[in-house]
A protein has these predicted regions:
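Bacterial N-terminal signal peptides
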Residues: 14-24
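Divalent-metal-activated hydrolytic enzyme cores
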Residues: 26-88, 114, 123-141, 158-253
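Bacterial N-terminal signal peptides that target proteins for export
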Residues: 2-14
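Loop/turn elements at helix/coil->beta-strand transitions in domains of secreted/extracellular proteins
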Residues: 92, 142-145
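Short glycine-enriched loops at secondary-structure junctions
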Residues: 97-102, 122-125, 151
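Conserved functional hotspot residues or short segments at active or partner-binding sites
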Residues: 148
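Glycine-rich, flexible N-terminal cofactor/catalytic loop recognition
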Residues: 73, 81, 85-93, 98-103, ...
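Short helix-loop-beta junction
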Residues: 109-118
């Protein structure tokens, strides 16, 4: 069985590389399918997490997004990573993002299996259950960075702007209303037809989610105050593939 797995591995590496490059908009210089991927053992995953500061993890994500948006993702042996991480996990960051199919965090940040915790919900809102998951990721599993990632043209944001009512979705969209109400001074209609308004609400929603995480979790707030973690926000642009990190004031030291 191991022999059969090894025969498929080069094809998986190449297919994954080409797939990510295609998603990112492609560059004129794609990675060669013969490039040798980094093969980390579990100790390497653990070392990377333990020795990284929150600032270094943030820089790692930024560099990964640059590779993705430029169409130059790192080659990966996903079968190897899957086998290695079956014995444990040491993700460096936890990403709270929308369920939108066009915004997968591992691709956007050019990360691999075992590198990120993912918490996904329409509109990337922060509720008690999701914040509890972040507490596990950081306090128990050792992640150094919490990222709230919104994105452009978000359907949940548009729904909140239009005050859509639809079953259980109604209650979820109500949680975005504070962001809608926060946005002032944008010219034009205050609904989904006005994309400038929609994007302003998306950013306000990210800011409020970061604030909400600190309010709901004394654990995470304390860890941030002690520089053990950082909590940041960003917006992913569906058209360019690039992430823009938002300047949000950190918890006072």
């Amino acid at each position: 069985m191991k022999k059969a797995t090894s025969l498929f591995r080069p094809r998986v590496i190449w297919a994954a590389t080409l797939f990510v490059a295609a998603l990112s908009g492609c560059s004129s210089t794609p990675i060669s399918p013969t490039a040798t991927p980094e093969r980390r053992d579990l100790a390497a995953f653990k070392k990377q997490q333990a020795e990284s500061t929150p600032a270094q993890v943030l820089d790692w994500l930024k560099r990964g997004n640059e590779r993705f948006a430029s169409g130059r993702p790192e080659p990966r042996d996903m079968l190897h990573d899957q086998e290695v991480t079956a014995a444990g996990q040491y993700p460096r960051a936890v990403i709270l993002s929308c369920i939108d199919s066009r915004a997968p965090a591992e691709f956007i940040f050019d990360a691999g299996i075992g590198d990120l915790f993912n918490a996904r919900i329409a509109g990337n809102i922060a509720d008690a259950d999701l914040v509890g998951s972040m507490e596990f990721a950081c306090k128990v599993a050792g992640s150094k960075l919490v990222v709230v990632m919104g994105h452009t043209s978000c359907g949940a944001i548009k729904g909140a702007c239009d005050r859509v009512q639809l079953g259980n979705l109604t209650g979820l969209l109500d949680k975005i209303q504070p962001a809608v109400e926060t946005v002032q001074g944008v010219a034009g209609e205050r609904n989904s037809k006005n994309m400038q308004f929609v994007e302003a609400v998306a950013e306000a929603n990210v800011r409020l989610a970061v604030t909400r995480i600190r309010e709901l979790s004394p654990i995470l707030k304390s860890m941030e105050s002690e520089s053990q973690i950082n909590i940041v926000g960003c917006i992913y642009d569906l058209e360019t593939g690039r992430v823009r990190f938002i300047d949000i004031e950190s918890t006072p030291k």
